[in-house]
Amino acid sequence: MKGYGWGIGSVVLVTVAQLILKWGMMNTPLMSLADINGQFVFNHLPQFIAVICGLAGYALSMLCWFFALRYLPLNRAYPLLSLSYALVYLGAVSLPWFSESATLLKTLGAGFILLGIWLINTKPIAKD
């Protein structure tokens, strides 16, 4: 069970990181490397902090993932990563600042991902 906790921790961190990165980047104007100077960073500090926090979330997620792999067989652990696809979709359509639309097809896709994860991690019924 310890491995699943680490795996879920990794999924939650990577999901939050992705949503934070999206917010930071969608609120940062288009730029080139030449545009980045102290004034630009100061003017867009919340966005840069969000991007840095998102990258840190990815790093922490990877650390959790290392521990998940230590305790879980790969054929059980790896499908857990797919949870983040469904969770990011739910976050993107639920949080008003993203203004992303939910469609039946996308929602069904997220549902199938969840169903697949459940099927892979369900123990087979023992035959007597």
Curated annotation (Swiss-Prot):
<comment type="subunit">
    <text>Heterodimer of ArnE and ArnF.</text>
</comment>
<keyword id="KW-1133">Transmembrane helix</keyword>
<dbReference type="GO" id="GO:1901505">
    <property type="term" value="F:carbohydrate derivative transmembrane transporter activity"/>
</dbReference>
<feature type="transmembrane region" description="Helical">
    <location>
        <begin position="6"/>
        <end position="26"/>
    </location>
</feature>
<feature type="topological domain" description="Periplasmic">
    <location>
        <begin position="27"/>
        <end position="47"/>
    </location>
</feature>
<keyword id="KW-1003">Cell membrane</keyword>
<feature type="topological domain" description="Cytoplasmic">
    <location>
        <begin position="123"/>
        <end position="128"/>
    </location>
</feature>
<keyword id="KW-0448">Lipopolysaccharide biosynthesis</keyword>
<dbReference type="GO" id="GO:0009245">
    <property type="term" value="P:lipid A biosynthetic process"/>
</dbReference>
<protein>
    <recommendedName>
        <fullName>Probable 4-amino-4-deoxy-L-arabinose-phosphoundecaprenol flippase subunit ArnF</fullName>
    </recommendedName>
</protein>
<keyword id="KW-0444">Lipid biosynthesis</keyword>
<dbReference type="GO" id="GO:0005886">
    <property type="term" value="C:plasma membrane"/>
</dbReference>
<comment type="function">
    <text>Translocates 4-amino-4-deoxy-L-arabinose-phosphoundecaprenol (alpha-L-Ara4N-phosphoundecaprenol) from the cytoplasmic to the periplasmic side of the inner membrane.</text>
</comment>
<feature type="topological domain" description="Cytoplasmic">
    <location>
        <begin position="1"/>
        <end position="5"/>
    </location>
</feature>
<comment type="similarity">
    <text>Belongs to the ArnF family.</text>
</comment>
<feature type="transmembrane region" description="Helical">
    <location>
        <begin position="48"/>
        <end position="68"/>
    </location>
</feature>
<feature type="topological domain" description="Periplasmic">
    <location>
        <begin position="99"/>
        <end position="101"/>
    </location>
</feature>
<keyword id="KW-0812">Transmembrane</keyword>
<dbReference type="GO" id="GO:0009103">
    <property type="term" value="P:lipopolysaccharide biosynthetic process"/>
</dbReference>
<comment type="pathway">
    <text>Bacterial outer membrane biogenesis; lipopolysaccharide biosynthesis.</text>
</comment>
<feature type="transmembrane region" description="Helical">
    <location>
        <begin position="102"/>
        <end position="122"/>
    </location>
</feature>
<feature type="transmembrane region" description="Helical">
    <location>
        <begin position="78"/>
        <end position="98"/>
    </location>
</feature>
<keyword id="KW-0441">Lipid A biosynthesis</keyword>
<dbReference type="InterPro" id="IPR022832">
    <property type="entry name" value="Flippase_ArnF"/>
</dbReference>
<keyword id="KW-0472">Membrane</keyword>
<feature type="topological domain" description="Cytoplasmic">
    <location>
        <begin position="69"/>
        <end position="77"/>
    </location>
</feature>
<dbReference type="InterPro" id="IPR000390">
    <property type="entry name" value="Small_drug/metabolite_transptr"/>
</dbReference>
<keyword id="KW-0813">Transport</keyword>
<keyword id="KW-0443">Lipid metabolism</keyword>
<keyword id="KW-0997">Cell inner membrane</keyword>
